[in-house]
Design a protein with these regions (language model features):
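Feature captures the catalytic ectodomains and active-site-proximal regions of enzymes
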Residues: 1-338
């Protein structure tokens, strides 16, 4: 019985190494054309996105807004790129007085809808996001529709992260998850993975609320005698901020160093553990980003440094080979398996 555990963290600086030395390392060069969270996860699973998803720097078009308002019975406010926290400070009061939905986007391909839980019931907010997901097709097909319920009083609004819900577009091609499930292997997920892949190819899952909750659920899954993949998202949504990447990357590495022993303690002889980051940064503007990959396990070649590897899809190719699945989906098999 073989198991592969793939853990995705927040941003880590390319040259950082955990205190517990990995058995093997690699630097993965991202191939997908738009560096969004969703395409990073898809590429790790073998699906490279060469066509950028649409973004809306000027907000969503009026024709769509009219259809959405008619379908939901609510007007919307904002409708432009905005910081998630700042939009509550600037428009939370307007929303609670009027009942209008807060619609905002970002630099990524995303439609975010926020509402106070006492103004719009959370289940209704979910329904409105499902409506948006159906209306956003063709040139409007964003990668993710996100429900962002919040609570609190004016000046002290905060998102209810455990009630955050993501409605992703379905992957445009086959992924490692599909290949494993079709081969009757287990595919477990923790965190936002279930949403990022629109539930496709996953046999069991747990959503999580932040790093620590995700870690505990990952460790619980590792207690099971399963045969296949555990794909765990431990990210807290903290990318390597351009303003202070050193501070953010250091904090994320400290979290890994503190908790890596817990993961390694649960590794069995036939397990392999791959740890990488959801985001990173490039010193050159426009250059494809590199994601550090740390590999552990008795079946990993000790001391192997794979250097720069083109594509995050080398992770899926290597895991598929290790688990005995013939399908590869592209990407190089890393020279780390004994």
């Amino acid at each position: 019985m073989k198991r592969a555990i793939l853990v995705v963290l927040d941003g880590i600086r390319p040259n950082d190494i955990p205190k517990i030395a990995p058995d093997a390392v690699a630097s993965l060069q991202e191939l997908s054309s738009d560096h969004s969270s969703i395409t990073v996860f898809w590429e790790l699973a073998g699906l490279v996105s060469y066509t950028p998803m649409p973004t809306f720097p000027n907000g969503f078009p009026k024709r769509f807004i009219k259809k959405f308002e008619e379908a939901t019975g609510h007007h919307v406010i904002v409708n432009r790129p905005y910081s998630g926290s700042q939009v509550l400070d600037d428009f939370g009061g307007d929303h609670t007085r009027s009942g209008d939905l807060i619609l905002f986007t970002s630099q990524e391909s995303v439609f975010q809808l926020a509402a106070h839980e006492k103004v719009v019931p959370v289940e209704d907010l979910y329904k409105y996001c499902e409506i948006a997901r159906k209306l956003l097709f063709g040139k409007l097909q964003v990668g993710q529709v996100i429900a962002r319920p919040f609570t609190g009083d004016f000046g002290h609004y905060e998102y209810i992260e455990e009630k955050r819900r993501v409605y992703s577009m379905e992957p445009a091609g086959r992924t490692m998850l599909d290949a494993l499930k079709d081969d009757d292997l287990d595919v477990f997920s923790v965190g936002k993975v279930i949403d990022i892949f629109a539930a496709r190819g996953i046999t069991d899952f747990e959503r999580s609320d932040g790093f620590q909750d995700g870690l505990e659920k990952t460790l619980r899954f590792m207690e099971y005698d399963f045969n296949g993949l555990l794909f765990s998202d431990l990210s807290r949504g903290e990318a390597l901020e351009k303003r202070n990447p050193v501070k953010t990357g250091t904090k994320n590495m400290e979290a890994l160093d503190e908790n890596l022993p817990k993961l390694l303690e649960e590794l069995k002889d036939e397990d392999i553990l791959f740890v990488t980051s959801r985001s990173t940064f490039s010193m050159k503007e426009g250059a494809n980003r590199c994601h550090p990959l740390f590999m552990y396990g008795k079946n990993i070649v000790h001391g192997q440094n794979c250097g720069d590897v083109q594509g995050l899809n080398g992770v899926s190719a290597t895991i598929l080979k290790y688990l005995g699945v013939k399908e590869r989906l592209g990407g190089p098999v890393l020279p780390v398996l004994k």
